[in-house]
Amino acid sequence: LIKSMGFAPENIILCDTKGVIYQGRTEGMNQWKSAHAAKTDTRTLEEAMKGADVVFGLSQKGAFSEEMIRSMADRPIIFAMANPDPEITPEEVARVRDDAIMATGRSDYPNQVNNVLGFPYIFRGALDVRASTINDAMKIAAVNALASLAREDVPDDVAAAYQGNRPRFGAQYIIPVPFDPR
């Protein structure tokens, strides 16, 4: 999906438990990994994170170290989405970076990435137009709608879920909360 949204494929490096998924690698490869193999000399997650602007973690607790986060580009965006424990916690990131934007899969941290924000609405839209598949255009429309919603002022009923603290778009609020009825 990120390629469909305009991310340059040559700037994307995928990793698995064996390291970087690169062109020519044979160990642990399959047709899906091969389709996204990078042309790179980078071989480890640690190397791949050096200078990176964004990292998406979908693995396990502890996969990202403070040193890896420190090595990223200025103002890095970190999606640490392993559940129940993210690859690195916001507290760990804050020890080494004061410029990071971070999201996790956990409701007790800011910027919870939760599929409940998209699934019911994407499915409702597909039903309404009698679509037989969910395509990238539908997913991108959902992404754009959520991004727009995060930039809007938060209504009183949503602010109540924050114990009266009204979130505003910024590093601590890039994703609407699941309680948001809009």
Outline where the language-model segments fall:
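Long hydrophobic segments that form regular secondary structure
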Residues: 42, 46-98, 115, 130
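Ser/Thr-centered flexible coil motifs
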Residues: 28-30, 65, 135, 155
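Alpha-helical scaffold segments in soluble metabolic enzymes
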Residues: 1-4, 47, 51-54, 67, ...
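Adenosine-phosphate binding glycine-rich loop
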Residues: 80-181
